[in-house]
Amino acid sequence: MNDAALAPDVSAALERGLQAQSLDAAFAAPLLRYLALLVRWNKTYNLTAVRDPREMVTRHLLDSLAMQPYIASGTLADLGTGPGLPGIPLAITRPQLQVTLVESNGKKARFMREALRHLELGNARVAESRAEALDEPAAYDHLTARALDTLAGIIAVGGHLLRPGGSLLAMKGVYPHEEIAALPAGWTVGEVHPLQVPGLEGERHLVVVRKG
Protein backbone atom coordinates (compact mmCIF):
# COMPACT_ATOMS: atom_id res chain seq x y z
CA MET A 1 0.00 0.00 0.00
CA ASN A 2 1.31 3.44 -0.86
CA ASP A 3 -0.11 6.64 0.55
CA ALA A 4 -2.32 7.00 -2.53
CA ALA A 5 -4.10 3.81 -1.45
CA LEU A 6 -5.27 5.41 1.78
CA ALA A 7 -8.85 6.65 1.65
CA PRO A 8 -9.26 10.38 0.96
CA ASP A 9 -10.86 10.93 4.37
CA VAL A 10 -7.64 9.70 6.01
CA SER A 11 -5.45 12.33 4.37
CA ALA A 12 -8.13 14.97 4.95
CA ALA A 13 -8.27 14.12 8.66
CA LEU A 14 -4.50 14.40 8.93
CA GLU A 15 -4.41 17.72 7.10
CA ARG A 16 -7.11 19.13 9.40
CA GLY A 17 -5.23 17.87 12.43
CA LEU A 18 -1.94 19.40 11.31
CA GLN A 19 -3.68 22.72 10.78
CA ALA A 20 -5.23 22.53 14.26
CA GLN A 21 -1.77 21.85 15.71
CA SER A 22 -0.23 24.75 13.74
CA LEU A 23 2.06 22.40 11.81
CA ASP A 24 3.12 22.85 8.19
CA ALA A 25 0.85 21.08 5.69
CA ALA A 26 4.00 19.84 3.93
CA PHE A 27 4.43 17.30 6.73
CA ALA A 28 1.28 15.49 5.59
CA ALA A 29 3.05 13.68 2.72
CA PRO A 30 5.80 11.94 4.75
CA LEU A 31 3.40 11.23 7.61
CA LEU A 32 0.98 9.55 5.18
CA ARG A 33 3.82 7.48 3.71
CA TYR A 34 4.70 6.31 7.21
CA LEU A 35 1.05 5.58 7.97
CA ALA A 36 0.56 3.58 4.76
CA LEU A 37 3.61 1.47 5.56
CA LEU A 38 2.36 0.91 9.11
CA VAL A 39 -1.06 -0.18 7.84
CA ARG A 40 0.53 -2.63 5.40
CA TRP A 41 2.95 -4.19 7.88
CA ASN A 42 0.33 -4.28 10.62
CA LYS A 43 -1.76 -6.76 8.63
CA THR A 44 1.02 -9.34 8.94
CA TYR A 45 3.05 -8.40 11.99
CA ASN A 46 0.45 -6.99 14.41
CA LEU A 47 2.48 -3.90 15.28
CA THR A 48 -0.44 -2.05 16.86
CA ALA A 49 -3.91 -2.97 18.08
CA VAL A 50 -5.33 0.02 16.19
CA ARG A 51 -6.25 -1.23 12.71
CA ASP A 52 -8.35 1.52 11.14
CA PRO A 53 -6.19 4.10 9.28
CA ARG A 54 -8.54 6.94 10.21
CA GLU A 55 -8.23 6.00 13.88
CA MET A 56 -4.45 5.73 13.49
CA VAL A 57 -4.35 9.36 12.36
CA THR A 58 -5.92 10.49 15.62
CA ARG A 59 -4.57 8.00 18.13
CA HIS A 60 -1.08 7.61 16.72
CA LEU A 61 -0.01 10.53 14.52
CA LEU A 62 -1.83 13.51 16.02
CA ASP A 63 -1.48 12.21 19.58
CA SER A 64 2.28 11.85 19.06
CA LEU A 65 2.57 15.31 17.54
CA ALA A 66 0.74 16.95 20.45
CA MET A 67 4.05 17.01 22.37
CA GLN A 68 5.98 18.56 19.49
CA PRO A 69 5.80 22.20 20.70
CA TYR A 70 7.52 21.27 23.96
CA ILE A 71 10.58 19.56 22.48
CA ALA A 72 13.61 21.63 21.57
CA SER A 73 16.38 20.55 19.25
CA GLY A 74 19.09 18.19 20.45
CA THR A 75 19.09 14.45 21.07
CA LEU A 76 16.04 12.41 22.02
CA ALA A 77 15.58 8.75 22.98
CA ASP A 78 12.05 7.41 22.52
CA LEU A 79 11.68 4.52 24.97
CA GLY A 80 9.46 1.56 24.16
CA THR A 81 8.58 3.22 20.88
CA GLY A 82 6.77 0.21 19.39
CA PRO A 83 6.40 0.93 15.66
CA GLY A 84 7.98 4.38 16.11
CA LEU A 85 5.50 6.40 18.14
CA PRO A 86 6.00 9.23 18.92
CA GLY A 87 9.58 9.13 17.65
CA ILE A 88 9.06 8.91 13.89
CA PRO A 89 6.38 11.64 13.67
CA LEU A 90 8.62 13.85 15.83
CA ALA A 91 11.64 13.16 13.61
CA ILE A 92 9.58 14.07 10.53
CA THR A 93 8.34 17.37 11.96
CA ARG A 94 11.56 18.30 13.79
CA PRO A 95 14.41 17.67 11.32
CA GLN A 96 16.91 19.34 13.67
CA LEU A 97 16.15 16.71 16.33
CA GLN A 98 18.30 13.55 16.47
CA VAL A 99 16.00 10.68 17.48
CA THR A 100 16.92 7.22 18.75
CA LEU A 101 14.03 4.75 18.60
CA VAL A 102 14.49 2.28 21.46
CA GLU A 103 12.57 -0.99 21.01
CA SER A 104 13.48 -4.58 21.95
CA ASN A 105 10.80 -6.29 19.83
CA GLY A 106 12.49 -7.57 16.68
CA LYS A 107 9.57 -7.25 14.27
CA LYS A 108 8.88 -3.67 15.40
CA ALA A 109 12.56 -2.80 15.06
CA ARG A 110 12.62 -4.26 11.53
CA PHE A 111 9.55 -2.24 10.61
CA MET A 112 11.13 0.96 11.87
CA ARG A 113 14.33 0.36 9.92
CA GLU A 114 12.26 -0.09 6.78
CA ALA A 115 10.25 3.05 7.58
CA LEU A 116 13.41 5.12 8.04
CA ARG A 117 14.79 3.80 4.74
CA HIS A 118 11.48 4.39 2.96
CA LEU A 119 11.18 7.93 4.32
CA GLU A 120 14.90 8.69 3.87
CA LEU A 121 14.81 9.98 7.43
CA GLY A 122 18.42 10.72 8.28
CA ASN A 123 17.84 12.17 11.75
CA ALA A 124 16.56 8.94 13.32
CA ARG A 125 18.04 5.55 14.11
CA VAL A 126 16.82 2.32 15.69
CA ALA A 127 18.34 0.85 18.86
CA GLU A 128 17.04 -2.73 19.08
CA SER A 129 17.41 -3.03 22.83
CA ARG A 130 15.59 -2.80 26.11
CA ALA A 131 16.00 0.70 27.51
CA GLU A 132 17.75 -0.53 30.65
CA ALA A 133 20.32 -2.42 28.55
CA LEU A 134 21.20 0.53 26.30
CA ASP A 135 24.76 1.51 27.20
CA GLU A 136 24.62 5.21 26.32
CA PRO A 137 24.82 6.96 29.71
CA ALA A 138 23.92 10.66 29.81
CA ALA A 139 23.79 10.73 26.00
CA TYR A 140 20.41 12.42 25.53
CA ASP A 141 18.86 15.83 26.08
CA HIS A 142 15.33 14.40 26.11
CA LEU A 143 13.56 11.12 26.77
CA THR A 144 10.04 10.42 25.57
CA ALA A 145 7.67 7.66 26.58
CA ARG A 146 4.10 7.48 25.36
CA ALA A 147 2.65 4.30 26.85
CA LEU A 148 5.52 2.62 28.64
CA ASP A 149 5.16 2.73 32.44
CA THR A 150 4.69 4.97 35.45
CA LEU A 151 7.00 7.96 35.73
CA ALA A 152 9.11 6.13 38.32
CA GLY A 153 9.15 3.03 36.13
CA ILE A 154 10.33 4.99 33.09
CA ILE A 155 13.10 6.58 35.15
CA ALA A 156 14.13 3.18 36.52
CA VAL A 157 14.71 1.71 33.05
CA GLY A 158 15.81 4.78 31.10
CA GLY A 159 16.91 7.50 33.48
CA HIS A 160 20.60 6.67 32.97
CA LEU A 161 20.30 7.76 29.33
CA LEU A 162 19.44 11.36 30.22
CA ARG A 163 22.09 14.01 30.79
CA PRO A 164 21.94 16.11 33.99
CA GLY A 165 19.46 18.91 33.40
CA GLY A 166 17.74 16.93 30.66
CA SER A 167 14.01 16.32 30.50
CA LEU A 168 11.70 13.32 30.41
CA LEU A 169 8.51 14.04 28.46
CA ALA A 170 5.87 11.47 29.36
CA MET A 171 2.43 11.28 27.78
CA LYS A 172 -0.33 10.57 30.29
CA GLY A 173 -4.12 10.55 30.35
CA VAL A 174 -5.60 12.18 33.45
CA TYR A 175 -3.33 14.31 35.64
CA PRO A 176 -1.02 11.74 37.32
CA HIS A 177 -1.00 13.01 40.91
CA GLU A 178 0.12 9.70 42.44
CA GLU A 179 2.89 9.14 39.90
CA ILE A 180 4.26 12.64 40.48
CA ALA A 181 4.24 12.07 44.24
CA ALA A 182 6.23 8.84 43.75
CA LEU A 183 9.10 10.37 41.76
CA PRO A 184 12.54 9.25 42.98
CA ALA A 185 14.99 11.65 44.58
CA GLY A 186 16.81 13.88 42.13
CA TRP A 187 13.88 14.15 39.73
CA THR A 188 11.41 17.04 39.76
CA VAL A 189 8.36 17.99 37.72
CA GLY A 190 9.04 21.04 35.61
CA GLU A 191 5.65 21.47 33.96
CA VAL A 192 2.48 19.55 33.24
CA HIS A 193 0.84 20.60 29.98
CA PRO A 194 -2.79 19.72 29.21
CA LEU A 195 -2.92 18.62 25.58
CA GLN A 196 -5.60 18.98 22.96
CA VAL A 197 -5.47 16.21 20.37
CA PRO A 198 -7.76 16.86 17.37
CA GLY A 199 -10.46 14.20 17.24
CA LEU A 200 -9.48 12.55 20.53
CA GLU A 201 -11.82 12.66 23.50
CA GLY A 202 -10.62 12.35 27.07
CA GLU A 203 -7.85 14.03 29.01
CA ARG A 204 -4.23 14.05 27.85
CA HIS A 205 -1.30 15.55 29.72
CA LEU A 206 2.39 15.91 28.95
CA VAL A 207 4.46 15.64 32.12
CA VAL A 208 7.92 17.22 31.87
CA VAL A 209 10.26 15.77 34.51
CA ARG A 210 13.76 17.17 34.92
CA LYS A 211 16.87 15.32 36.02
CA GLY A 212 18.77 17.20 38.72
Swiss-Prot record:
Give the keywords, sorted: Cytoplasm, Methyltransferase, rRNA processing, S-adenosyl-L-methionine, Transferase
Residues noted as binding S-adenosyl-L-methionine in the record, renumbered to the chain:
80, 85, 131-132, 146
Native organism is Xanthomonas euvesicatoria pv. vesicatoria (strain 85-10)
UniProt family annotation: Belongs to the methyltransferase superfamily. RNA methyltransferase RsmG family.
Q: Does the keyword Methyltransferase apply?
A: yes
Which reaction is this enzyme known to catalyze?
A: guanosine(527) in 16S rRNA + S-adenosyl-L-methionine = N(7)-methylguanosine(527) in 16S rRNA + S-adenosyl-L-homocysteine
Q: What is this protein called?
A: Ribosomal RNA small subunit methyltransferase G
Q: What does this protein do?
A: Specifically methylates the N7 position of guanine in position 527 of 16S rRNA.
